[in-house]
């Protein structure tokens, strides 16, 4: 209610003081009770259609139903619904909601229904419904959702109805519906779906409604599973059709054969299509703020899907990402910076960055990129920074940078580029800095242009140098004269180790042959060359690769075999292979032979051989394998020969060879098998399998030595006590605290204080950042293959000279954000491969000269955010970073005062001067003894490991001598005890305890209750030096020795003259009538079950009540109503036709039509039931025929029957043939044509048949599905418009002629129901037809018959009947086939089950008796019995008797029961025009029946009003409130 100052109702102005009172009251009520513009009724808050632009505030916490539909809300924030823990129904449809923040629904744990349809949602955040376990119905239809992420519905485990139709979904991530096991309804129709992950719907056993039609399904080999899934469920997923390829377009998916789902090419068949989610929210493993998505160091192996569309920067560095897929970043058009540095990226799709018009920084350094695809940087017009350094790029196309006109810094530093084509940098008009150093440039005539370019544009700042020819080696390119760049046959223009491929400016070079190897006839011979790793570049045509007799120790997972599609044999025998990385053979599906004989393998696991799908021969002879577990050979299903000869195998786990399905030869000889109980299974397995084994023999125990395994009896395989639990388990490849990917181990942010056990020995990257390390773990030196160590964000305060020993392969060391103050001079000794060192964010002030003497490869030093003291002692560092720009210009000086804030990189070295000794704080960082850390006069000594060490005087200890040895100094005695120090004794001190305490430190309270004197059940409570007694209710005194009389006048608790009775448990009050409670203080409410009627008010009295009647009523219970004249009925003057009754509905006359009739006065017959087979309807006066649009609804359970027929020679016929609709049409052409519906309609349900005839074309559609079309291209004739239109059949002579001319295939008349026949959009009235006998009005019988396990047929001879499913019988298909009627003995009658075990016989006319076996019974035993309110029923036991209607009793059903409410649950129906409309779901109410005393009527006393959706027979729908009674009683007749 809105109030305006000074104005009230229409009666006139309100006084100011009265307005203030009203305003204050309205403010108090509105602020706490209901949001503005909303209506609150009970627990329902209705805010629909009020123009809201945001969720209103102050929604009551107890709200159960909230209606916000029909507003202008644009966004749902996280806290909009906070605190609404009781909400069950939330209506948000028909708004403009574009985004819902994650967590918005977290508080609504009771939410059951949520409608978000008809909004503008583009994305669905993951985990949005994670706390809505009670959610059963979710409507997201008619939005713009583009993708369904994997965790979209995680948490909504009780979801039964999910509607996603009419969106723009093009991507469904695998597992998106996995949690929805109870789903019954799923709609995905009218989207842009092209493919669906395999088995997406297999876990939905209750699914009964499923829609997938109107999508863009591409029916290739990846969608073959869907066809089989739909065929197994023929009643759901109807009209799901293929949109491609062209040969399958328009076909139903379920009808396409498996062989027709094909993929072109082997690569496509193996590649399961994936989709990049076009919009999303912050990934769970990342952090997002201010448009920046930070996923650094999260162990990612792929770019996350479903990222925020609005992000401007994404940080993905320090992960394990191996490739950038097509369009990976294209959806994120606002991106300005992408950082993918320090990953494992080897492949980039050409369109990975397509469309990023705002991108200005792209960081890709520290990866494994070898090639830049054509056009990969196309369209990046605003790019200013491009870092490609520290990769393996060997070739740059001339047009690689043609769109980068605004690029200012390009780094190609540290790659494998040997030459650059002229014009590569021509388009870089804004370039200011170019890094080309650390590349093996061949300075021949092809590179002359680069020298000229660099002299003209001195922008190359990293010092790029020549590597070849020898005369120009190590000279800076920009300083060499042009004439020196020449091509000569006398010079060698290659770099040793790189001449295995040909140079080509287009980067399409094919490998010639690996260095030092021989290549002949597709055989690459690289044996006996002392190789330590497999050559990187091998010709793609290679069929056999010989690498035997080398020194290879580790087989790395480089993906090199993906390009060798012709490779058949790999020989790695006689090497030093001790480790094979998981996935090392990925892509080697064509390899059939792998030889690993004579190596150093100690264990094997299935991941080592992943990718060898076609392997047939695996040779593992002469290794060090000790056991075989059941994961050793998983996936090698094609292996026929497996040799494990001459290893150290002692045991084999059960099932170890079960996955080798093709195994025919297994060599286990020369192994020391221990034939104990763990190997008992193998003897039996070898005997049963028909494979060649060579009879392996036992080595242990002694009594079985040299006995073949197959010959050992099962009882002889026995174990000593305690050995049963042994066995062979796979070696753990990753610590429990860490995550491992290939050779990358991530143990970040795990609160570690020590290095976890189980780190693989071949680890190359180890991430220990974000932990609690105080020192560098000493075990790091045992991992000799380490290339990267990240120890940032720990608490490391010092390094030693041995912290990084034995790490010769280390290239990246990150020590940033620790507490380092001083670096020892030999801390980095031996790190000759180190390229990147980060000391950023520590407390370092100085570094000793020569500290980087061994790190000759160092190119990046991060030392910023340190308080550098830039005096003469740091001058060397300034000069060192300037050579090669090793420091990026971040580090600044913190002292002396005149150097404060100056950059280490740009400040001239001469400025670094010593004007006196550094401050004591600076000196103490590398000489902590200067800060006097030792306390209590301890002596400080420098220590190379612990930085310093204190020598403590007598009486003190600790690192800083801070701990006193005086045992009483810490006050060990508690509770006021006195400490006495002891010298030379076992105990360093003793305590003198006060009274009430004891123990070594006086910490124990003495138990004074040991000898207590509490009597009569009193409880002793210990105190300090004493105790007290807690007495029962009826005792008192210090020891509970005195009995208390609780019923004495002073203590009597009973009120209102109640009698007090003493009991052992205390006093008990016996109350007077009318009172209750423990002390009889409560006056009983006698009005609780009062019988006052007609709105009378009950007045409570002592032990009684009285009724205060409303005006005009009288009687003790106000049951006598006033005398009023009977009102005039609205039905007077209303004429209802065809036997309809007029009823009063809200003072409005309404005709209640009989079944089959419709119209305001029931004047039209709209539905008919064909009960005889030889009958029909005949229309003779039709307009605009034969150009007609015919629609009708049909229900039948028959296979054949005529629906429509018109014409003679030139005809149109519609018939039911074998359950399908068949249309035959002949407008004058010959021969006539016919089409059939794909659907069957003989299931007893109503189906809509739509037929459009226009000249020579006919369209047929069933239930609004895709139409079937037929064209006749003969000479056009007009059909005979004078011939009648027959419905449901036709005369015998017409039938015979049509059958003879093949116009119909089955002449059977229609048997079933037809309703709502429209011809040219005009609803037909069957009363205006020639109706033959056998056609009856109405199709309602099946609404009265419920079939539990079957389908209702409305037109059976005895009336509606159920066609039961297999295994069910009975009138309602509710009895099992093997129920009590199975094998019944009814002779002349029908068996009727009474319960699960017994039955009775319902006799035919003329028979009686319990088994209907007595002839001569009266044909009509009920003839003389007149039941007033019921019907007569005869049985063999009771004879003829009355069965009364509900509400009546008596022998003749003559007695009406008292007013009562009979519960009803059914659909509610109304009539609108000619259409019959009913609610979409049943509702519950009570029917008031019975009699009332006097002149009262039995009617509803309590009514419930709710809004329901109605669906009408003409296809329309609407919503309307329905009012139904929920409680009945006697009241004044209305």
From Swiss-Prot:
Signal sequence bounds: 1-33
Species annotation: Homo sapiens
Superkingdom of the source species: Eukaryota
One Gene Ontology molecular-function label: Roundabout binding
All residue ranges annotated as the CTCK domain in the record: 1459-1534
Repeat region (LRR), residues: 62-83, 86-107, 110-131, 134-155, 158-179, 182-203, 310-331, 334-355, 358-379, 382-403, 406-427, 541-562, 566-587, 590-611, 614-635, 638-659, 762-783, 785-806, 809-830, 833-854
Keywords on record: Developmental protein, Differentiation, Disulfide bond, EGF-like domain, Glycoprotein, Leucine-rich repeat, Neurogenesis, Repeat, Secreted, Signal
Tissue: Predominantly expressed in adult forebrain. Expressed in fetal brain, lung and kidney.
Listed name of the protein: Slit homolog 1 protein
Subunit and interaction comment: Interacts with ROBO1 and GREM1.
């Amino acid at each position: 209610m809105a109030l305006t100052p000074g104005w009230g109702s229409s009666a006139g102005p309100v006084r100011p003081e009265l307005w203030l009172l009203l305003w204050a009251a309205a403010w108090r009520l509105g602020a706490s009770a209901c949001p503005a513009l909303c209506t609150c009724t009970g627990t329902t808050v209705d805010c629909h259609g009020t123009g809201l632009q945001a969720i209103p505030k102050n929604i009551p916490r107890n709200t159960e139903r909230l209606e916000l539909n029909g507003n202008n809300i644009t966004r749902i924030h996280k806290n909009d619904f906070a605190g609404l823990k009781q909400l069950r129904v939330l209506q948000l449809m028909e708004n403009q909601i574009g985004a819902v923040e994650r967590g918005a629904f977290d508080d609504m744990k009771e939410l059951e229904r949520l409608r978000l349809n008809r909004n503008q949602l583009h994305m669905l955040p993951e985990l949005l419904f994670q706390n809505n376990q009670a959610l059963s119905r979710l409507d997201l239809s008619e939005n713009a959702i583009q993708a369904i992420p994997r965790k979209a519905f995680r948490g909504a485990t009780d979801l039964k109805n999910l509607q996603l139709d009419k969106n723009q979904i093009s991507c469904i991530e695998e597992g998106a519906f996995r949690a929805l096991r109870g789903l019954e309804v799923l709609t995905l129709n009218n989207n842009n779906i092209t493919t669906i992950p395999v088995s997406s719907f297999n876990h939905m056993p209750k699914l009964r409604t499923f829609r997938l039609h109107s999508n863009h399904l591409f029916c290739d080999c990846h969608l073959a599973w869907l066809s089989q899934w739909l065929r197994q469920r023929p009643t759901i997923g109807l009209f799901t059709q293929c949109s491609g390829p062209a040969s399958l377009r328009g076909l139903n998916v379920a009808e396409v054969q498996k062989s027709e789902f094909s993929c072109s090419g082997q690569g496509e068949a193996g590649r399961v299509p994936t989709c990049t989610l076009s919009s999303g929210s912050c990934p769970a493993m990342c952090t997002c703020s201010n448009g920046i998505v930070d996923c650094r160091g999260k162990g990612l192996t792929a770019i996350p899907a479903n990222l925020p569309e609005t992000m401007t920067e994404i940080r993905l560095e320090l992960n394990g990402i191996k490739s950038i897929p097509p369009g990976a970043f294209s959806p994120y058009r606002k991106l300005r910076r992408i950082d993918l540095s320090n990953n494992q990226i080897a492949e980039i799709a050409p369109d990975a960055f397509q469309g990023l018009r705002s991108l200005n920084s792209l960081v890709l350094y520290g990866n494994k990129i070898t090639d830049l695809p054509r056009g990969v940087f196309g369209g990046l017009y605003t790019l200013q920074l491009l870092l490609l350094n520290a990769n393996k790029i060997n070739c740059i196309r001339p047009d690689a940078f043609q769109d980068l006109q605004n690029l200012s810094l390009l780094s190609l530093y540290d790659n494998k580029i040997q030459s650059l084509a002229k014009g590569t940098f021509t388009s870089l008009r804004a370039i200011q800095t170019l890094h080309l150093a650390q590349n093996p440039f061949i300075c021949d005539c092809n590179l002359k242009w680069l020298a000229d370019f660099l002299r003209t544009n001195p922008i190359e700042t990293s010092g790029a140098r020549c590597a070849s020819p020898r005369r120009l080696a190590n000279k800076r390119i920009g300083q060499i004269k042009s004439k020196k760049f020449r091509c000569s046959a006398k010079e060698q223009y290659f770099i040793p180790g790189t001449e295995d491929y040909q140079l080509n400016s287009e980067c399409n070079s094919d490998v010639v042959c690996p260095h030092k190897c021989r290549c002949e006839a597709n055989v690459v011979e690289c044996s006996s060359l002392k190789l330590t790793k497999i050559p990187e570049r091998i010709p793609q045509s290679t069929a056999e690769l010989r690498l035997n007799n080398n020194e290879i120790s580790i087989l790395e997972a480089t993906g090199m075999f993906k390009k060798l599609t012709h490779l058949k044999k790999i020989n790695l025998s006689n090497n030093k292979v001790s480790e094979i990385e998981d996935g090392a053979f990925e892509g080697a599906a064509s390899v059939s032979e792998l030889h690993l004989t004579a190596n150093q393998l100690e264990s094997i696991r299935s991941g080592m051989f992943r990718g060898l799908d076609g392997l047939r021969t695996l040779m593992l002879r002469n290794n060090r394998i000790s056991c075989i577990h059941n994961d050793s050979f998983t996936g090698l299903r094609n292996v026929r020969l497996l040799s494990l000869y001459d290893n150290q195998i002692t045991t084999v786990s059960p099932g170890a060879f079960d996955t080798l399905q093709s195994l025919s030869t297994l060599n286990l000889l020369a192994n020391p098998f221990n034939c104990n109980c763990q190997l008992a299974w193998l003897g039996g397995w070898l005997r049963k399998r028909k494979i060649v084994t060579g009879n392996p023999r036992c080595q242990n125990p002694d009594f079985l030595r040299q006995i073949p395994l197959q010959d050992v009896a099962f009882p002889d395989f026995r174990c000593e006590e305690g050995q049963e639990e042994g066995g062979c388990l796979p070696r753990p490849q990753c610590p429990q605290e860490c995550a491992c990917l290939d050779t990358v181990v991530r143990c970040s942010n795990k609160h570690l204080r020590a290095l976890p056990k189980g780190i693989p020995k071949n680890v190359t990257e180890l991430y220990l950042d974000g932990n609690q390390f105080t020192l560098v773990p000493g075990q790091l030196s045992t991992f000799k293959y380490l290339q990267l160590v990240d120890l940032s964000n720990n608490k490391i305060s010092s390094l030693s000279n041995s912290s990084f020993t034995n790490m010769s392969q280390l290239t990246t060391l990150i020590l940033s954000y620790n507490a380092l103050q001083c670096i020892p001079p030999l801390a980095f000794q031996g790190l000759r491969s180190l390229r990147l060192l980060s000391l950023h964010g520590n407390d370092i002030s100085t570094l000793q000269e020569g500290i980087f003497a061994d790190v000759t490869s160092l190119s990046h030093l991060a030392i910023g955010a340190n308080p550098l003291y830039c005096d003469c002692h740091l001058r060397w560092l300034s000069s060192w970073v300037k050579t090669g720009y090793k420091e990026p210009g971040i580090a600044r000086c913190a002292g002396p005062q005149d150097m404060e804030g100056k950059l280490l990189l740009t400040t001239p070295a001469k400025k670094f001067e010593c004007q006196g000794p550094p401050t004591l704080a600076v000196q103490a960082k590398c000489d902590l003894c200067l800060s006097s850390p030792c306390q209590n006069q301890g002596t400080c000594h420098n220590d190379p490991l612990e930085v310093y060490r204190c020598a403590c005087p007598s009486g003190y200890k600790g690192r800083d001598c801070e701990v006193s040895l005086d045992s009483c100094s810490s006050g060990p005695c508690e509770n006021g005890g006195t400490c006495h120090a002891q010298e030379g004794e076992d105990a360093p001190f003793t305590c003198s305890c006060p009274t009430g305490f004891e123990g070594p430190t006086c910490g124990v309270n003495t138990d004074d209750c040991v000898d207590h004197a509490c009597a009569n059940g009193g409880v002793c409570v210990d105190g300090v030096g004493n105790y007290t007694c807690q007495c029962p209710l009826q005792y008192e005194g210090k020891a509970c020795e005195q009995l208390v009389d609780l019923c004495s006048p002073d203590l009597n608790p009973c009120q209102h003259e109640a009698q007090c009775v003493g009991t052992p448990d205390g006093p008990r009050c016996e109350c007077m009538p009318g009172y209750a409670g423990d002390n009889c203080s409560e006056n009983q409410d006698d009005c609780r079950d009062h019988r006052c009627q007609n709105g009378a008010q009950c007045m409570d009295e002592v032990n009684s009540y009285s009724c205060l009647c409303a005006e005009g009523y009288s009687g003790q219970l106000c049951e006598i109503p006033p005398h009023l004249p009977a009102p005039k009925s609205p039905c007077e003057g209303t004429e209802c036709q065809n036997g309809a009754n007029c009823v009063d509905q809200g003072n409005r006359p309404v005709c209640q039509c009989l079944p089959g009739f419709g119209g305001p006065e029931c004047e039209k017959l709209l539905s008919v039931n064909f009960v005889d087979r030889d009958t029909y309807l005949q229309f003779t006066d039709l307009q605009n025929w034969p150009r007609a649009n015919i629609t009708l609804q049909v229900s039948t359970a028959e296979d054949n029957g005529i629906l429509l027929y018109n014409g003679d020679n030139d005809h149109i016929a519609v018939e039911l043939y074998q359950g399908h609709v068949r249309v035959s049409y002949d407008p004058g052409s010959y021969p006539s044509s016919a089409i059939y519906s794909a659907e069957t309609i003989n299931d007893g349900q109503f189906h809509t048949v739509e037929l459009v005839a226009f000249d020579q074309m006919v369209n047929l559609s069933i239930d609004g599905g895709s139409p079937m079309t037929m064209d006749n291209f003969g000479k056009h004739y007009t059909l005979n418009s004078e011939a009648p239109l027959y419905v449901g059949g036709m005369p015998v002579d017409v039938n015979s002629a049509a059958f003879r001319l093949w116009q119909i295939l089955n002449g059977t008349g229609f048997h079933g129901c037809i309703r709502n026949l429209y011809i040219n959009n005009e609803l037909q009235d069957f009363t205006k037809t020639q109706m033959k006998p056998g056609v009856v009005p109405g199709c309602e019988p099946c609404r009265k018959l419920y079939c539990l396990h079957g389908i209702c047929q409305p037109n059976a001879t005895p009336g509606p009947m159920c066609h039961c499913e297999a295994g069910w019988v009975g009138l309602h298909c509710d009895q099992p086939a093997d129920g009590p009627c199975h094998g019944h003995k009814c002779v002349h009658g029908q068996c009727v089950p009474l319960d699960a075990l017994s039955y009775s016989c319902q006799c035919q006319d003329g028979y009686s008796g319990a088994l209907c076996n007595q002839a001569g019974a009266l044909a009509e035993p009920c003839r003389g019995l007149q039941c007033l309110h019921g019907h007569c029923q005869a049985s063999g036991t009771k004879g003829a008797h009355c069965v009364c209607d509900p509400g009546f009793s008596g022998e003749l059903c003559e007695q009406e029961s008292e007013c009562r409410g009979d519960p009803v649950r059914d659909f509610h129906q109304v009539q609108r025009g000619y259409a019959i409309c009913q609610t979409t779901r049943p509702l519950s109410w009570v029917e008031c029946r019975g009699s009332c005393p006097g002149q009262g009527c039995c009617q509803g006393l309590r009514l419930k009003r709710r809004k329901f959706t109605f669906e009408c027979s003409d296809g329309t729908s609407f919503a309307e409130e329905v009012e139904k009674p929920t409680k009945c009683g006697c009241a004044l007749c209305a």
